[in-house]
Amino acid sequence: TNTAVGYDALVAATGASNTAMGSDAGGSVTSGSNNMFLGFHAGLSGSPGGAITTGSNEIVLGDENITEAHVQVDWTVASDQRDKTDFTALDLGLDFVKALAPVTYKWDKRSKYGDKTSEGYDLNAQTPDGTHKEDWLDIGFKAQEVEALEIAAGYNKSSKTNLVSSHTGDGKQMGLQYSKFVPILVKAIQEQQTLIESLTARITTLEG
């Protein structure tokens, strides 16, 4: 059983236990199950998660026009040691961080240039030319560049551990899981501190 509220919400769904609220919310999902879509066009091509068709156990909030998200407190992410196993030390650190290229940019969404299809918007209809770009600056990384660094480092293991998330099977919509950068940054700081302490000790010896 699916639950849908809104025009064409879950219109093509054959899977079960999907929930959608909003016009066209979850409109592209077919055999996918246990998904949640909240807001206008949530889950269509161009939305934050791309077009979800056969995917399951996913949550999508809103479409590509969302500019802010508000919550009173921080998200709490499950991290109980008792629910984990096969621990190994993370080997991505300072060298990986040094290779990252932070940038400022303006969004120029492909969905603004394409026609609406049954799965959302045709993201390959036209090449963005700047006529629909936003007038505000954002900061971050380019997903394709981070993916190349992941692959080079041998870290591109699975969609659940990768820094880069390609939400659709055809790779039309790529994103970054920024919270996963935190352990890497911690490792980089630790490596840098070890180097600083080593150099400080050498200087002390030379000066002594």
Region roles according to the model:
Residues S79-G208:
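Intramolecular chaperone/auto-protease modules of tailspike-like proteins
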Residues T1-D80:
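Glycine- and small/polar-enriched repetitive beta-structure motifs of secreted/surface proteins
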